């Protein structure tokens, strides 16, 4: 039996009054809405009662007690703020007598923020009334007092294109600047190949044919591959990763800042790098025709793609060709290894796509010509790599790996940061080719470390919870994607049934919805000091090894791997000499603080993903600001007490048809079936329903799209 709530122009509970009482204190995360606030706890989500809203901000961790309201609703009473999420606020500067006032850009904030009379930050930075600014919070608001801030920087007028992005950066505590001490340390670094090769662990691979394949607009290249067919019909795959650990010493200025950031953050209009550009875009970037230090994993596989042997070691490489994914795919199509998908849509869109493919082929042919200078047929190289990728994908599928087919929706911006197009970057044969190589290298390194019982930053993906799987199974069955037998298998966590559901929806209008439903039922992957396996990959051992330029856990893995190699191949005395630079010594050494590092990396990854998503939503909202009143076809992708979320066919962008806009009748929300049903007319809205909407309103600060249902 579904848990039902009845709604008319918003949420409302029809149960009678019950006795009000406080329940024991809980902690949770604040989630602000336009006219309400919720606390998300392990025990459920609770709406915040009126008092206390002034002192909380989105993302804060708070202590609450749960109180039954006179209408029977369980409400959260704020007992105190445990941890603040934001250290800055973005808003418009105004004056009120001797005080400066910051009017927050986030209309959900109920508190005021003042600049004290003695604060000269506005004059010092040339800020005038009406300017948008980033202000650092000095004291947080309470129920009785406003917050105090000081201006850190002027953004510009309130119509600045990056105003929303600056808001997100302030919300998550991100900055464009990098500490001077770390920058100075980076400028003092240099590459000395001769000195590096004196290390007996490092091997010279500069005579090996190595290539990089990345997005066409990539600026840093931290992974490369080499591949040879063996006489027995198998493969020798080399995965070569930038050797960041050679340059970044434990507890140095760069390391401390990288450990604080833990990840590069990819916002819609900029990248906030984990490492200084001197490293990420220069010394550690595997650019063509330049000697670079790398960490290599050589993997020998048989003709069926099964691993027979692997060997990790530091190296020196020289990339010969820099390819992009589209160019690589064009060569694979030309070789007959794969086919392009059929182009659909308006004539001008098809024409533009065809032109793009022709340009990609030209880039691919230029790379092919460069490879001939090394007596390598690049087409054959890519065909072999594609064959191996397909073999590895089959092996993963056979052992229970689940491949979710999701597209990355992003806004393309002009040089001023104004969105000009919405694109969906989907997986291609070329991206899969590299992805499979990186997955395999990660597995091999994790197994190498786990076999020796070595602690590191392992990537752990736990089994999904039965409750989450049950909800997804019910929704998929209602969509007609799966039958009852398959639903039962999904509810039990069968990887085969999960993959079958993804495959059944592939190529249909429901494919994005199915993938979203199943992804929501998964646990989030975490970093842990001990290996616990990876559910989605069906991998007994897994870690991140392949992106130390942008992920701190990868740098940790490189360090412990290099130290263990020294111990095994050169002896304990040599390893002892390397220890301070690689992992430190004493109370603040890597082994002592590894659990904290793993937790910090997991938390920072979650925040970076959220910030990236938020800025893309902002740019997408800016794109649709000029398209108010336009109508589009879409699919109901989610149903809640707030209304219907609709994903547009053309761009895969999602917006809300609020329950207020559906009419004046009562709507009954079935939380289990995920439906809204009109009490008077019986009109029913459900997942997967095809609709036509009109863009009715946009919020470019928070990246929200409001739709009006047409039919």
What positions do the PLM features span?
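Charge-lined substrate channels and their catalytic hotspots, especially those that engage the 3′ end
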Residues: 2-238, 245-294, 320-323, 327-330, ...
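Short acidic/polar mixed-charge low-complexity motifs
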Residues: 44-46, 98, 107-110, 233-234, ...
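Feature marking long nucleic-acid-engaging regions of large polymerase/nuclease enzymes
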Residues: 3, 118-120, 135, 153, ...
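A residue-level signal for conserved active-site and pocket-lining positions in enzyme catalytic cores
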Residues: 59, 130, 151, 213, ...
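Conserved nucleotide-binding/hydrolysis micro-motifs of P-loop NTPases
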Residues: 69-70, 139-142, 157, 244-246, ...
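Helical mechanochemical/support elements of P-loop NTPase systems and associated helical scaffolds
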Residues: 74, 144-147, 161, 209, ...
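Structured C-terminal cores of nucleic-acid metabolism proteins
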Residues: 23, 444, 462, 466-470, ...
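Short, surface-exposed charged micro-motifs
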Residues: 27-29, 92, 224-226, 298, ...
